[in-house]
Amino acid sequence: MASTIKEALSVVSEDQSLFECAYGSPHLAKTEMTASSSSEYGQTSKMSPRVPQQDWLSQPPARVTIKMECNPNQVNGSRNSPDDCSVAKGGKMVSSSDNVGMNYGSYMEEKHIPPPNMTTNERRVIVPADPTLWSTDHVRQWLEWAVKEYGLPDVDILLFQNIDGKELCKMTKDDFQRLTPSYNADILLSHLHYLRETPLPHLTSDDVDKALQNSPRLMHARNTGGATFIFPNTSVYPEATQRITTRPDLPYEQARRSAWTSHSHPTQSKATQPSSSTVPKTEDQRPQLDPYQILGPTSSRLANPGSGQIQLWQFLLELLSDSSNSNCITWEGTNGEFKMTDPDEVARRWGERKSKPNMNYDKLSRALRYYYDKNIMTKVHGKRYAYKFDFHGIAQALQPHPPESSMYKYPSDLPYMSSYHAHPQKMNFVAPHPPALPVTSSSFFAAPNPYWNSPTGGIYPNTRLPAAHMPSHLGTYY
């Protein structure tokens, strides 16, 4: 038993490659590397007769930190080399690919953790959410931010001065490489693709409105139909959201400057951000729209029946067109909703107009139900005495109906078709004794009647009549 243990220990102690680095001192001859890989690393090695190559590949990889300098060209030269080829050099981890261009994927992995010189937890870009809506100024701001955020060298922003968002989204990788180096083109194109595919996963427009409600530029964007959003850094979304929602008093321009200049001027960003005690809080300054000014002209025009008797819905619009009637009926917003604050008074006035002194709200409400199917108004559920006009349905109801098409009528100028017009109910039947065709000349083969050449003459071609409708003057031979 003891001899077996000694023999096993001797075998293990001979194979030093299991315990020492594969890139150790040159006197180690038994390394578990193939002949091709050893020649690539410039080391003399031989194949181990005891342990096959598959056993070496199945060994769990171990992280080895080499305490010596090595040539980077010899480390990263084979696909069989270890995954971690970093060496300790002067107290700093130096990668073997420092002098080789780094790809975008590895660069973004390193950029996932903010560098030590970052003093803020977010990078905000205040541009429209859809990059295709960017103006040339938005494109310039985005490029300036990307240069500061990713440290992009040799980016000439003037080359992009005539490019807006729509043209920017149409640019390919070759188009970017014509304006900036290949490495910068990869980063810009990837970030643009990210903005287009995943816009604002944690921020909504309501959050931005609460944070920027006092901004004059935001009010202009509301009036012009634009949308303004904030793009924080993807690694710190919750903190960025908290900062934005807890500082609604921060003005738009100061927030923009502090977010875009904090990377290059960390000390100035602290100075530009005012404290909450210095910025006065103001009330929401959104203008309150007057429904009587907006809906007044429309209700006055629709309430005038012109000629004829006024209908109930027109009478209600007549009352709503005058703000002095708000004690009994008033608008609820600008979407056509209204409420009868005193329904009995409204019913009494309607009874006076129609000379019905017994009119009350129950009769009035039953009359209003008739307009539901006509798409003139609807009942607002959950609210008493509240209704809503459908102005689109009213416009459809007021359109004049077109007259009946003439293609279903026979020409009225034909003398032998007078019986059809005398008896409209027999339009589809042949007269029992049609008169003879009029002949206007002495010749029997006169010019054909214009009816047979008219475009409406062939409406019913090849009409087959049942036997019961054959003329009675025909003989039995037929």
From Swiss-Prot:
Expressed in mesoderm- and, to a lesser extent, in ectoderm-derived tissues. GO terms for cellular component: nucleus. Coiled coil: none annotated. One of its GO terms (biological process) is regulation of transcription by RNA polymerase II. GO terms for molecular function: DNA-binding transcription factor activity, RNA polymerase II-specific; sequence-specific DNA binding. Keywords: Activator, DNA-binding, Nucleus, Transcription, Transcription regulation. Residues 113-199 form the PNT domain. The keyword DNA-binding applies. Residues 34-47, 259-280 have a biased composition (Polar residues). SMART domains: ETS, SAM_PNT. It is found in: Nucleus. InterPro entries: Ets_dom, ETS_fam, Pointed_dom, SAM, SAM/pointed_sf, WH-like_DNA-bd_sf, WH_DNA-bd_sf. PROSITE patterns: ETS_DOMAIN_1, ETS_DOMAIN_2, ETS_DOMAIN_3, PNT. The keyword DNA-binding applies. Residues 34-56, 73-93, 242-303 are annotated as: Disordered. Residues 310-390 bind DNA. Pfam families: Ets, SAM_PNT. Belongs to the ETS family. PANTHER family: ETS, TRANSCRIPTIONAL REGULATOR ERG. Acts as a transcriptional activator. This is Transcriptional regulator Erg.
